[in-house]
């Protein structure tokens, strides 16, 4: 498989028809491909997230990351935009879902799309990936250490959010969860609650918890990076999408 790709900043249609910035990459190939919506983490629409978009394209998927902070701070640095959004209480849920639905529609509208779209997120993006998989139309989802899915957030968190466990019955696609045994948000006790609920509901899912890994073990530019967990996690991600996004 060739890793030739096209990567660029584009404008896509988001919530209520708004035009928002996004970063897209796709393999240069004639064969139909699946798509992946990449949700950036709370620190914002940054270079690490764009590198992830390109990684999917290099492995045969079209991918797009919508800038969820575009309306709040267009043109600002990721850190500044994230600070503005946190100060405002976070991205409203309806707007978030509208932008993610727009990103999926963008992928499915591409000439080489096979009609399938997955979603992935890390940290806050992992939580949002689970939310989107419960309320929107996706073919596969990956939650990388998304917190406050099965438990409420601690008091004083600047962004308002509620547990998502009551939405689990609506999970519309297979879910892969990748977690660290040493993580505090979410701790293993929280992922065990979610595991039990998805099992009770008969959902298709797989969870993997890595010993010796905490939060953000995929982040190569942080002290939290754990190479063995990250390498195995990427292998599982591509296996998962190969199973559910390829035709």
Q: What kind of feature is each model-predicted range?
A:
Residues 1-247:
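N-terminal cap/leader regions of alpha/beta-hydrolase-fold enzymes
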């Amino acid at each position: 498989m060739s890793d030739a790709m096209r990567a660029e900043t584009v404008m896509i249609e988001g919530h209520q028809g708004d035009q928002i910035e996004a970063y897209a990459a796709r393999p240069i190939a004639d064969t139909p491909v699946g798509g992946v919506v990449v949700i950036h983490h709370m620190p914002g629409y940054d270079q690490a997230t764009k590198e992830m978009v390109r990684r999917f394209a290099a492995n045969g998927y079209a991918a797009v990351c919508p800038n969820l902070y575009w309306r709040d701070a267009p043109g600002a640095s990721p850190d500044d935009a994230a600070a503005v959004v946190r100060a405002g209480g976070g991205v409203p849920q309806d707007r978030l879902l509208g932008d993610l639905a727009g990103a999926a529609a963008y992928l499915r509208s591409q000439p080489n799309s096979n009609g399938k779209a997955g979603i992935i997120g890390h940290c806050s993006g992992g939580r949002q990936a689970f939310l989107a998989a419960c309320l929107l139309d996706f073919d596969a989802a990956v939650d990388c250490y998304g917190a406050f899915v099965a438990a409420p957030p601690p008091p004083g968190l600047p962004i308002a959010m509620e547990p998502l466990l009551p939405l689990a019955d609506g999970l519309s696609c297979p879910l892969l969860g990748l977690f660290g045994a040493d993580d505090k948000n979410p701790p293993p006790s929280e992922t065990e609650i979610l595991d039990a609920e998805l099992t009770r509901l008969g959902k298709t899912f797989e969870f993997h918890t890595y010993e010796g890994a905490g939060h953000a073990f995929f982040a190569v530019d942080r002290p939290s990076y754990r190479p063995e967990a990250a390498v195995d996690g990427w292998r599982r991600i591509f296996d998962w999408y190969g199973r559910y996004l390829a035709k």
